[in-house]
Amino acid sequence: MGANVSTPDQRFQVTHFRSTKPWTPRPEIYPFKVNSPCIVEIKNMNQWKSRLNALKDTNKLLVIEFTAKWCGPCKTLEPKLEELAAKYTDVEFVKIDVDVLMSVWMEFNLSTLPAIVFMKRGREVDMVVGVKVDELERKLNKYTQSFF
């Protein structure tokens, strides 16, 4: 008896510590980004159409990541894609959840996840299906260096 009983002074110290030291994650423990500002998540058809129309008349490369919450390989690819989006700042990266916007996924005649589609001037120029990071980076290099 008494092993789990704290004195009033000990309770004050814990309460005082909690009130004066707000918790913040330390970068060495949490090095990942919770929400990548480099990849825009498209959540509805209007957002998709406006993004596509805005880039039709530019030479900017649009990289579309088709994903789903239940897709294991998609989750494997996500951190690498965020790295690439941070590296290739001149490229527009968007993410589309196929469960939310199935019609967009079907426009591209896709059947496998993850799928990455490359577009320039409103038309599809290439794609990568599956977790093929080397191929993805090679194509990013190819389309960011070429102009047409």
Curated annotation (Swiss-Prot):
Stretches assigned to the Thioredoxin domain: 1-145
Gene3D superfamilies tied to this protein: Glutaredoxin
Pfam families tied to this protein: Thioredoxin
Location in or out of the cell: Cytoplasm
Signal sequence, renumbered to the chain: none
Record's protein name: Thioredoxin H8
Species for this entry: Arabidopsis thaliana
CDD domains listed in its UniProt record: TRX_family
GO cellular component, one term: cytoplasm
Alphabetized UniProt keyword annotations: Cytoplasm, Disulfide bond, Electron transport, Redox-active center, Transport
